[in-house]
């Protein structure tokens, strides 16, 4: 018979994502930023998404957009994209990649990021791998952009923040950082074998 403590051990091996979302307005537009896992482990991959909605008359076109992040996060190549009513648009090669931000230049692309007047929302998203960040400390994120109507808009420290703790398990290292079913099954089989051989 397997004790409750042993079962709890296997249950604890699977980590679940802890997303964080904030929404705010600047009179003319509304923004929502979501981090797929705000309490990741070292080695995990997280997705940061910024959603743009226009709440006043007239469209707003973005010339460029910066996604600010802690320098201990590493951008995942080819993950930056813009999603609008027409679908997904890759941002690279028109993407500047720096230790603490990435910046998309939409004056060079074949499409524009447009906040439609009470229309469908546009989204900018990118993936990052969590490196050797300070653990147990809130690390800020934010965004910044230039547009044809609002000019320079700076929310580079708006959030949400992430708090890193520990290292990821023997899973995929994806957004959840959870252990794979195969590794859990192998561990359970070993435990059962050990219990069966005891006198």
PLM regions: where:
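Hydrophobic residues positioned within well-ordered beta-strands of beta-sheet architectures
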Residues: 46-50, 63, 122-126, 141
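Ser/Thr/Gly/Pro-rich low-complexity, disordered linker/stalk segments of secreted
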Residues: 166-199
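Low-complexity, intrinsically disordered segments enriched in Ser/Thr together with acidic residues
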Residues: 105-139
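Serine/threonine-enriched low-complexity regions used as flexible
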Residues: 128-166
């Amino acid at each position: 018979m397997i004790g409750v403590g042993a079962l709890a051990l296997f249950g604890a091996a699977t980590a679940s994502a802890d997303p964080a979302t904030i929404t705010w307005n600047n009179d003319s537009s509304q923004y929502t930023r979501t981090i797929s896992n705000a309490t990741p482990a070292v080695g995990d991959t997280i997705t940061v998404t910024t959603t743009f909605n226009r709440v006043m008359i007239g469209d707003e076109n973005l010339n460029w957009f910066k996604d600010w992040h802690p320098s201990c996060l590493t951008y995942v190549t080819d993950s930056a994209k813009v999603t609008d009513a027409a679908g997904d648009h890759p941002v690279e090669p028109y993407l500047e990649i720096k230790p603490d931000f990435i910046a998309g230049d939409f004056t060079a692309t074949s499409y524009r990021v447009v906040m439609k007047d009470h229309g469908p929302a546009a989204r900018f998203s990118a993936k990052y791998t969590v490196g050797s960040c300070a653990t147990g400390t809130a690390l800020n994120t934010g965004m910044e952009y230039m547009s044809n109507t609002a000019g320079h808009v700076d929310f580079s420290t708006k959030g949400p923040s992430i708090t890193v703790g520990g290292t990821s398990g023997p899973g995929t290292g994806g957004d959840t950082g959870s252990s794979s079913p195969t590794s859990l099954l192998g561990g359970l089989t070993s435990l059962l074998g050990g219990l069966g051989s005891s006198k």
